[in-house]
Amino acid sequence: MTTDTQSLPAWLDKVRWDDNGLVPVIAQEAATNDVLMFAWMNREALAKTIETQRAVYYSRSRKRLWFKGEESGHVQHVHEVRLDCDEDVVLLKVEQVSGIACHTGRHSCFFQKFEGTVENGDWVAVEPVLKDPEHIYK
């Protein structure tokens, strides 16, 4: 399958892409149901994800495809791809290689938990750093 945007499959048209041609994506660990991260995909990224069974996102800052783990080795093997009821959010059920999904070296990007009250609360890191980011991105 080619991923030239002119020849992408018709099933991609069911997804409700935003004005920038992107759709939000949630990566969830298949074995534990832990929410690992949030990212974006364009049509090419979603097609590549289906084709390779590895998570491929679209980096808005780099304006290019981002093959999860291309620098860190922390790839996501895709077990299942789902589309929500409004057809505007994609869920990937993945196996997270090495257990690290976040660029901070943690298991999940959602490692900060709100504790306290509206008047006196704060975000607290509740997941440990599994690997120093300095050693992940050399």
From Swiss-Prot:
Mg(2+) binds at D84, D86, D88. Pathway: Amino-acid biosynthesis; L-histidine biosynthesis; L-histidine from 5-phospho-alpha-D-ribose 1-diphosphate: step 3/9. Coiled coil: none annotated. Its EC number is 3.5.4.19. Its cofactor is Mg(2+); Zn(2+). Keywords: Amino-acid biosynthesis, Cytoplasm, Histidine biosynthesis, Hydrolase, Magnesium, Metal-binding, Zinc. GO terms for cellular component: cytoplasm. InterPro entries: PRA-CH, PRib_AMP_CycHydrolase_dom, PRib_AMP_CycHydrolase_sf. Pfam families: PRA-CH (PF01502). It is an enzyme of class 3 (hydrolase). It is found in: Cytoplasm. GO terms for molecular function: magnesium ion binding; phosphoribosyl-AMP cyclohydrolase activity; zinc ion binding. Binds 1 Mg(2+) ion per subunit. One of its GO terms (biological process) is L-histidine biosynthetic process. It comes from the Bacteria. Homodimer. Belongs to the PRA-CH family. Catalyzes the hydrolysis of the adenine ring of phosphoribosyl-AMP. This is Phosphoribosyl-AMP cyclohydrolase. It comes from Burkholderia vietnamiensis (strain G4 / LMG 22486) (Burkholderia cepacia (strain R1808)). The lineage of its organism: Bacteria, Pseudomonadati, Pseudomonadota, Betaproteobacteria, Burkholderiales.
